[in-house]
């Protein structure tokens, strides 16, 4: 497992962003684990998370000019990544959107850097149904930006539905024609659990969940 994947999963565990047990998802599925990026709620945690995101995207070679964070959780994540990149000597513009357009002041739906004619990297927590990411893609294109890729914290690698055996991330990547990168995946989580004595007992429920809902490439 790549170092940034292991660091991210350990960080998520420390922050209580990654929990094990029984959780009912929005889809109605009963999951043995749950990820909540909202638990990265301090400067230190966000700084370390920004480093994990930066390492993950650096490993891909994707070229981009602007970092974009979809409202709401994507905003602090994109900001943390942009700050980390600046620490590494790469100063990049940052942009994000409001959920509702503002009618006064500077107005509009977008805040931050101009994206017109620029290659834009979307930074978010997860892709569940893909609705928020598709909305972000539309916002970027409407602003004249060119979507270059998407990076998320965790890819659950599970099928979107009984009729679509792609994951939500795979579906978005195919529809948009851009790569979707994950800092870590369900496969990484299984490896991580196997190597952690405190988590090894959760491996069997994780394996069973993957066997039932995992995309075919990892079953």
UniProtKB/Swiss-Prot annotation:
<keyword id="KW-0808">Transferase</keyword>
<feature type="binding site" description="in other chain">
    <location>
        <begin position="124"/>
        <end position="132"/>
    </location>
    <ligand>
        <name>5-phospho-alpha-D-ribose 1-diphosphate</name>
    </ligand>
</feature>
<dbReference type="InterPro" id="IPR000836">
    <property type="entry name" value="PRibTrfase_dom"/>
</dbReference>
<feature type="binding site">
    <location>
        <position position="128"/>
    </location>
    <ligand>
        <name>orotate</name>
    </ligand>
</feature>
<dbReference type="GO" id="GO:0044205">
    <property type="term" value="P:'de novo' UMP biosynthetic process"/>
</dbReference>
<feature type="binding site">
    <location>
        <begin position="34"/>
        <end position="35"/>
    </location>
    <ligand>
        <name>orotate</name>
    </ligand>
</feature>
<comment type="pathway">
    <text>Pyrimidine metabolism; UMP biosynthesis via de novo pathway; UMP from orotate: step 1/2.</text>
</comment>
<protein>
    <recommendedName>
        <fullName>Orotate phosphoribosyltransferase</fullName>
        <ecNumber>2.4.2.10</ecNumber>
    </recommendedName>
</protein>
<feature type="binding site">
    <location>
        <position position="102"/>
    </location>
    <ligand>
        <name>5-phospho-alpha-D-ribose 1-diphosphate</name>
    </ligand>
</feature>
<feature type="binding site">
    <location>
        <position position="156"/>
    </location>
    <ligand>
        <name>orotate</name>
    </ligand>
</feature>
<dbReference type="GO" id="GO:0046132">
    <property type="term" value="P:pyrimidine ribonucleoside biosynthetic process"/>
</dbReference>
<keyword id="KW-0328">Glycosyltransferase</keyword>
<comment type="similarity">
    <text>Belongs to the purine/pyrimidine phosphoribosyltransferase family. PyrE subfamily.</text>
</comment>
<dbReference type="GO" id="GO:0006207">
    <property type="term" value="P:'de novo' pyrimidine nucleobase biosynthetic process"/>
</dbReference>
<dbReference type="InterPro" id="IPR029057">
    <property type="entry name" value="PRTase-like"/>
</dbReference>
<keyword id="KW-0460">Magnesium</keyword>
<feature type="binding site" description="in other chain">
    <location>
        <begin position="72"/>
        <end position="73"/>
    </location>
    <ligand>
        <name>5-phospho-alpha-D-ribose 1-diphosphate</name>
    </ligand>
</feature>
<comment type="subunit">
    <text>Homodimer.</text>
</comment>
<dbReference type="InterPro" id="IPR004467">
    <property type="entry name" value="Or_phspho_trans_dom"/>
</dbReference>
<feature type="binding site">
    <location>
        <position position="98"/>
    </location>
    <ligand>
        <name>5-phospho-alpha-D-ribose 1-diphosphate</name>
    </ligand>
</feature>
<feature type="binding site">
    <location>
        <position position="104"/>
    </location>
    <ligand>
        <name>5-phospho-alpha-D-ribose 1-diphosphate</name>
    </ligand>
</feature>
<dbReference type="InterPro" id="IPR023031">
    <property type="entry name" value="OPRT"/>
</dbReference>
<keyword id="KW-0665">Pyrimidine biosynthesis</keyword>
<feature type="binding site" description="in other chain">
    <location>
        <position position="99"/>
    </location>
    <ligand>
        <name>5-phospho-alpha-D-ribose 1-diphosphate</name>
    </ligand>
</feature>
<dbReference type="GO" id="GO:0004588">
    <property type="term" value="F:orotate phosphoribosyltransferase activity"/>
</dbReference>
<dbReference type="GO" id="GO:0005737">
    <property type="term" value="C:cytoplasm"/>
</dbReference>
<feature type="binding site" description="in other chain">
    <location>
        <position position="26"/>
    </location>
    <ligand>
        <name>5-phospho-alpha-D-ribose 1-diphosphate</name>
    </ligand>
</feature>
<dbReference type="GO" id="GO:0000287">
    <property type="term" value="F:magnesium ion binding"/>
</dbReference>
<dbReference type="Pfam" id="PF00156">
    <property type="entry name" value="Pribosyltran"/>
</dbReference>
<comment type="function">
    <text>Catalyzes the transfer of a ribosyl phosphate group from 5-phosphoribose 1-diphosphate to orotate, leading to the formation of orotidine monophosphate (OMP).</text>
</comment>
């Amino acid at each position: 497992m790549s170092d940034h994947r292991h660091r991210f999963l350990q960080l998520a565990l420390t922050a209580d962003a990654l929990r094990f047990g029984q959780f009912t998802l929005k889809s109605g599925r009963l999951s043995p684990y749950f990820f909540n990026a909202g638990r990265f709620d301090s400067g230190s945690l966000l700084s370390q998370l920004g480093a994990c995101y930066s390492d993950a995207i650096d490993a891909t070679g994707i070229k981009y000019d602007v970092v974009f964070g979809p409202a709401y959780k994507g905003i602090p994540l994109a900001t943390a990544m942009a700050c980390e990149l600046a620490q590494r000597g790469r100063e990049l513009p940052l942009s994000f959107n409001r959920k509702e357009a503002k009618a006064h002041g500077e107005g509009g739906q977008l805040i931050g850097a101009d994206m017109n004619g620029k290659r834009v990297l979307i930074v978010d927590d997860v892709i569940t149904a893909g609705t928020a990411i598709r909305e972000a893609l539309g916002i970027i294109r409407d602003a004249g930006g060119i979507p270059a890729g998407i990076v998320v914290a965790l890819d659950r690698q599970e099928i979107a539905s009984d009729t679509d055996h792609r994951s939500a991330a795979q579906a978005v990547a195919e529809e948009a024609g851009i790569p979707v990168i994950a800092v870590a995946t369900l496969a990484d989580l299984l490896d991580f659990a196997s190597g952690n004595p405190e988590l090894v007992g959760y491996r069997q429920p994780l394996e069973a969940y993957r066997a039932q809902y995992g995309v075919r490439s990892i079953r």
